[in-house]
Amino acid sequence: MSDKVIIFDTTLRDGEQSPGASMTKDEKVRIARQLERLKVDVIEAGFAASSEGDFQAISAVAAAVKDSIVCSLARANDKDITRAADALQATNAKRIHAFLATSPLHMAVKLRMSPEEVLEQAKRSIRFACNLASDIEFSAEDGYRSEMDFLCRVVEAVINEGASTINIPDTVGYATPELYGEFIKTLRTRVPNSDKAVWSVHCHNDLGMAVANSLAGVKIGGARQIECTINGLGERAGNTALEEIVMSLRTRKDYFDMVCGIDATQIVPASKLVSQITGFIVQPNKAVVGANAFAHTSGIHQDGILKNRDTYEIMRAEDVGWSANKIVLGKLSGRNAFKQRLQELGITVEAEADLNVAFTRFKALADQKSEIFDEDIIAIMSDSAAAEEGEHYKFISLSQHSETGERPKSRVTFRMGDREISSEAEGNGPVDASLNAIEGIAKSGAEQLLYSVNAITSGTQSQGEVTVRLAKGGRIVNGVGTDPDIIAASAKAYLSALNKLHDPSQAKLNAQMTP
């Protein structure tokens, strides 16, 4: 019988550490619900001690999720661990994930603690955590660069104190597959009580080997939990990509002889949702979830596919959630057809009032473009959910004028608090003019780090999805806006980013590197 691999998703915590990928409480809940539909075993919802916003988001996820374990990260101290436990009160399936650095470099430079002090703190923190929850994970931060003898002592000690999962991260993405697998194997062999805990791997992608290292940790090392994120989202070069792990285990079951409980048909919906919320576009050639992942342009390849799909495809697009439904909705489509498509996309609308709002937005978009695709519907639902969050800034309308040889002018009407404001400005282009009009009133003083446009579907009728990244006071936020009018989408994206800057609960604790 095949071994079970636990899928631990940290999109909402480690994935959110990507510059600009900060998510609101409601956005985290929406992603968590999709992760639950994906049948993820453990959802790491955040770092409770890092901010009041993260604490509230973890609490909301804990209340919303019913079928997955909900986890909070914590540094290995009583204050952080208590905060994590408090945030998880709404769920009976909770995990506290405590971490402490164990490499010589981190202990000396960052912690300024001796190895013996680190060992005692690790033991003390796990002992304390076990009084607050029964499911405790310990991460040896920068574990792969730790000295083997010392790491064995720490791991043995925390298992004795009650840790049920031991995570050995490659925090800086330094490992290579065979060496990492052997490292985990050696640890499990040398730690006397290694059979009392589940061993976990957490790899970063700095050298492009996060997925390979994680799989080696399982195949060679004997780990049975993989920590990963949707789309490989994460700081620096990212984390292990969940979709690649799941489909590797599934497609090469003959080699790995392991299974996971993931519903693979929910992979693409999860990928699209995370991309839309964070504003991080999935590269077209990204494995499994990229737009070109199942595209064949070579004539020889196309001929082979037409004769037998197995000639050039090792998995089917529909297996990972690419829609095979060719029925396109339009302005004549009714409410039932719209509701049915939502169900097919795995989108749950609990209240009739929310469905009515979404359907109204659908009809408004259908008046602007003749065909509504799945990607359009996902964007509609994202906009509807954002509107429910009680934004401080809210787009109302826009008009602009431009002629060759003249500076474009734009007039933007938006709501700021309880006031409706119209503002005019000029700029180097219609987008610049529109954002200048908003900034002239908002006076945020934020630095614009990124402006990007992505067509949601193909063709000139496609909605534009605009991402604006702003920085202020050490915080970096992304705003996303969609509209068939690129100028309007740009204004919406800018206002979306301003909303995140305006919310003080979203300010993060800039404490230290995490696993």
Curated annotation (Swiss-Prot):
State whether keyword Transferase applies: yes
What keywords are annotated for this sequence in UniProt?
A: Amino-acid biosynthesis, Branched-chain amino acid biosynthesis, Cytoplasm, Leucine biosynthesis, Manganese, Metal-binding, Transferase
Q: Name one GO molecular function term.
A: acetyl-CoA C-acetyltransferase activity
Summarize where Mn(2+) binds, as residue positions. Answer: D14, H202, H204, N239
Q: Main subcellular localization, coarse class?
A: cytoplasm
Family classification: Belongs to the alpha-IPM synthase/homocitrate synthase family. LeuA type 1 subfamily.
The name under which this protein is listed is 2-isopropylmalate synthase
